[in-house]
Amino acid sequence: MRKAFLFLPVFLSAVAPAFGQTKAPQPSTTAKVPSVVPIKEIVDKGTVSGRKYTNDKLNFSLTLPAAWEIKPNNFADDMLRQGVDIRLKAPDNLRPGDQAKVNQSLRRVEVLLTASRARFDSYQNAILRVSAEDLKPNPQIKDAVDYFDAVRASYKSMKLPADFVYSDTKAEKLGRHEFAYLDIDSAAGKKRMYATVQNGFAVLFTLTYSSDDDLQSLRTILSDGNFKLK
């Protein structure tokens, strides 16, 4: 069963709606499995200067266009105060034992950057979340293709929602760097997940979108990014 939860951090980011759209939990006197992973930084979060994000520890930088708004690091806390919970945590519909396994796996994940692109012709925004997952417990993962192949294997081992459809692992060269990616369709919307492996971490760029223009914008962001910082 351990392998089924090996890459659930990616599963959670794929299944969750754009902003989580989960109401903040109400106080309860019933003992529950802790649902939120305690904050513990596993890798440097990087820095933001204007519209440029840089992570020296993971050797990459990227610049977001003016149409994108970079959210502050306390964005999840701000959303929680508004009644929307987007924190990394196990889904409520899992059994307590499975929730504990998922939350344990989430200890290897760090959200590095969250950004959104508002569309004036639609009520739907595009949401970009950049995250990193520590691969030290899984030395067999050598590159992003290996990573997404493992993700797909864990998908196959679980009972997913009927509307959850995911693609084969694919690769795309954007600029000077090659990424693996998955496409996902579900009730939560369309997602494109790009990944690369940097210094022992899987770095994920997860886009929730409705317009192909937003997807093209992400492709341009990655094409123009520098993934060989020294």
What are the roles of these predicted feature ranges?
Residues 1-20:
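Sec-dependent N-terminal signal peptides
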Residues 18-116, 120-122, 136, 158-179, ...:
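N-terminal targeting sequences that direct proteins away from the cytosol to non-cytosolic compartments
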Residues 123-130:
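Acyl/amide activation-and-transfer machinery of modular secondary-metabolite enzymes
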Residues 130-161, 222:
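Long, charged/polar, surface-exposed segments that mediate recognition or autoinhibition
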